[in-house]
Structures are given as structure tokens and as C-alpha cells.
């Protein structure tokens, strides 16, 4: 499948870690901008200053948390590819569950099970949506009739023509 044709694992981990940091920082910045604006005192200057302060203090922390999640997920995913010898959706689902469990380990076994279930379910939904999207997109472009490549199988009266017209039209 083309979906899984990506760069080798050491670079994939760094790439996913950086992408997750960027998503967390931008998404966290937008969320914190609204939160800081809403929780600031009345007055546009106070609200804008509160919004900017919330962005500066919380967005990098959220980006770092996302980067840890992305790096751990990619590390487990690459390990699963190496161990199993194939790259399929089960690796991502298992990686999501293990990442959720590992990141919740400090909160106890109940939290680990809950986070593992959420991580696995979330990644299963993402992988399922990707598979459905690929199937529906490929159904839009069905394979046409297969033409023979061997010109000896064509009737003798029919010569292969050029896509730009036949040379005989100019004689």
C-alpha cells in the first residue's frame, strides 16, 4: 500500500516527533488564545494581553507533550514493523494502545488500561477511516478494459495509431 511507503524508521521517528510538536504548538496556541482572551479582565487591551500571555506560557508545553506522544508512538510503531516484519494498520493500533498505556503508567494500572483502550480505539478509528477513504477513492477510478501490448494479436487491417493522428491523413 502506498500509504505506508514512508522514510526509514530512524528518520520517521524524528519527523513524527517534529510534526507532533508543530501540531501541538499551533493547536495549543489557538486554544490558549481563546482561553486567555475569555479568562482575562474586561477591556480589549487586557484581553489581548491575557491571550498573548496564555499562548506564550502554555503552547510550548502542549507542543512538547504532543512531541513526546508522537515520538513514543513512532518508536513503538517502528519496533512493531521490525518485530512483525510487515507494515499494516495493526501496528498503528497496537502502537496507539501501548503509547497510551506507557504515558499513563504513573497514574496506576486502571489509568493505564483506560488510556490503552482509548489509544487503541482512536487509532483503530483513524486507520479504519483511512482504509474506507482509500476504498471509496479507488472505486471512482475503476480499471478499464485491458488492452493487449502485443501488436501481432491485432487484426492485420488495423495498425496501431498515434495519439496525435495517423500519418496517412496528410498524403
UniProtKB/Swiss-Prot annotation:
Which UniProt keyword terms apply here? Disulfide bond, Membrane, Mitochondrion, Mitochondrion inner membrane, Protein transport, Translocation, Transmembrane, Transmembrane helix, Transport
Query: What is the primary gene name for this protein?
Result: Timm17a
Protein name as catalogued: Mitochondrial import inner membrane translocase subunit Tim17-A
Which cysteine-cysteine pairs are annotated as disulfide bonds in the entry? 9-78
Region Disordered: start-end pairs: 144-171
Subunit and interaction comment: Component of the TIM23 complex at least composed of TIMM23, TIMM17 (TIMM17A or TIMM17B) and TIMM50. The complex interacts with the TIMM44 component of the PAM complex and with DNAJC15.
Subcellular location as annotated: Mitochondrion inner membrane
Similarity field: Belongs to the Tim17/Tim22/Tim23 family.
For this protein, the parts annotated as crossing the membrane are 17-37, 63-77, 113-133
Query: Which InterPro entries does its entry note?
Result: Tim17
Q: Which membrane topology describes this protein?
A: Multi-pass membrane protein
> What happens to this protein after translation, modification-wise?
Degraded by YMEL1 downstream of the integrated stress response (ISR).
Where composition is biased (Low complexity), the residues are: 153-163
Q: Listed GO cellular component terms?
A: mitochondrion; nucleoplasm; TIM23 mitochondrial import inner membrane translocase complex
Q: What does this protein do?
A: Essential component of the TIM23 complex, a complex that mediates the translocation of transit peptide-containing proteins across the mitochondrial inner membrane.
Q: Which organism is it from?
A: Mus musculus (Mouse)
The organism's place on the tree of life at top rank: Eukaryota
Q: Name one GO molecular function term.
A: protein transmembrane transporter activity
Its taxonomic placement starts with: Eukaryota, Metazoa, Chordata, Craniata, Vertebrata
GO biological process assignments: protein import into mitochondrial matrix
Amino acid at each position: 500500500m502506498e500509504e505506508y511507503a514512508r522514510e526509514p524508521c530512524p528518520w520517521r521517528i524524528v519527523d513524527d516527533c517534529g510534526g507532533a510538536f508543530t501540531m501541538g504548538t499551533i493547536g495549543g496556541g489557538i486554544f490558549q488564545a481563546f482561553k486567555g482572551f475569555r479568562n482575562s479582565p474586561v477591556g480589549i487591551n487586557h484581553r489581548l494581553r491575557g491571550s498573548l500571555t496564555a499562548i506564550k506560557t502554555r503552547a510550548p508545553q502542549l507542543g512538547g507533550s504532543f512531541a513526546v506522544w508522537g515520538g513514543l508512538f513512532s518508536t513503538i510503531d517502528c519496533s512493531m514493523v521490525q518485530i512483525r516484519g510487515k507494515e499494516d494498520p495493526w501496528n498503528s493500533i497496537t502502537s496507539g494502545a501501548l503509547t497510551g498505556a506507557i504515558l499513563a503508567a504513573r497514574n496506576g494500572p486502571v489509568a493505564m488500561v483506560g488510556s490503552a483502550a482509548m489509544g487503541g480505539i482512536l487509532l483503530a478509528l483513524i486507520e479504519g477511516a483511512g482504509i474506507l477513504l482509500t476504498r471509496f477513492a479507488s472505486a471512482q477510478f475503476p480499471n478499464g478494459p485491458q488492452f493487449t501490448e502485443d501488436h501481432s494479436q491485432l487484426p492485420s487491417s488495423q495498425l496501431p495509431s498515434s495519439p496525435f493522428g495517423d500519418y496517412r491523413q496528410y498524403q
